[in-house]
Regions:
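Short hydrophobic beta/alpha edge segments that flank linear recognition/processing sites
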Residues: 30-48, 67-78
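PDZ-domain C-terminal substructure recognizer with occasional recognition of PDZ-binding tails
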Residues: 53-72
């Protein structure tokens, strides 16, 4: 099981808002697929999957504020 985390987006950014999930639990994703749109202080950004697999768990809902470095979903690579 792999975890997708919020990447560091600049020196001042400590948290981001989840705008819209582009996937749901059970969806198959490939490396490079946009899985979620987030908003930082400066921009809206699409977070790409770093793994091929199935989304097994979404850990934060649309509208939630999430600290940089925190896991937002889990992907099963098997």
């Amino acid at each position: 099981m792999k975890k997708v985390v919020i990447p560091k987006m600049g020196m001042a950014t400590t948290e981001v808002d989840i705008l819209t999930w582009k996937v749901k639990e059970g969806d198959t994703v490939k490396i490079g697929d946009i899985i979620v749109e987030i908003e930082s202080e400066k921009a809206n950004v699409g977070i790409e999957s770093e793994y091929n697999g199935i989304i097994t768990k979404i850990l934060h809902k649309d509208g939630e504020t999430v600290p940089v470095g925190e896991a937002i979903c889990e992907i099963d690579e098997s």
